[in-house]
Amino acid sequence: MRIGHGYDVHRFAEGDFITLGGVRIAHGFGLLAHSDGDVLLHALSDALLGAAALGDIGKHFPDTDPQFKGADSRVLLRHVVSLIHAKGWKVGNVDNTIVAQAPKMAPHIESMRALIAADLQVELDQVNVKATTTEKLGFVGREEGIAVHSVALLLRA
């Protein structure tokens, strides 16, 4: 078995929605990114790639490559899953922590879990998504951006 950890952060920018875990959430800002800015799926992809010793998303989907401009992070995650499967691994479980002062995540958590489970080709009870704030401390507390920590357990297929 292998364990991987992923971390990503994106700052807020102009826009009226963010995408987290594949779910579009109305918000007063968007997230600045080369792709769709789905910080949750980026951290999760890094955790999966790290567990399989396959590098990180920057190696596989560089932000200098125009083909990934505005890319759907669910498509990128599904590609990561194909890479780990090709190396003889399958997902045991994943645990994700969204760190955000706003918007409120609770109404969207179950939708995120369902989409992630589908993309990982696992059962819903193998995917956890939770959210916390920083009690108004730091860049997250000042509502300048969102961070996510992800942990993935891989098992031999």
UniProtKB/Swiss-Prot annotation:
Claim: Lyase is one of the keywords in the record: yes
Q: List the cofactors.
A: a divalent metal cation
Q: EC number(s) per UniProt?
A: 4.6.1.12
The cofactor binding remark recorded in the entry reads: Binds 1 divalent metal cation per subunit.
A GO term (biological process) for this protein?
isopentenyl diphosphate biosynthetic process, methylerythritol 4-phosphate pathway
UniProtKB keywords = Isoprene biosynthesis, Lyase, Metal-binding
Tell me a Gene Ontology molecular-function term this record carries. metal ion binding
Give binding positions for 4-CDP-2-C-methyl-D-erythritol 2-phosphate: 8-10, 34-35, 56-58, 61-65, 100-106, 132-135, 139, 142
SS bond list: none
Q: How does it assemble?
A: Homotrimer.
Role description: Involved in the biosynthesis of isopentenyl diphosphate (IPP) and dimethylallyl diphosphate (DMAPP), two major building blocks of isoprenoid compounds. Catalyzes the conversion of 4-diphosphocytidyl-2-C-methyl-D-erythritol 2-phosphate (CDP-ME2P) to 2-C-methyl-D-erythritol 2,4-cyclodiphosphate (ME-CPP) with a corresponding release of cytidine 5-monophosphate (CMP).
Query: Per its record, how is this protein called by name?
Result: 2-C-methyl-D-erythritol 2,4-cyclodiphosphate synthase
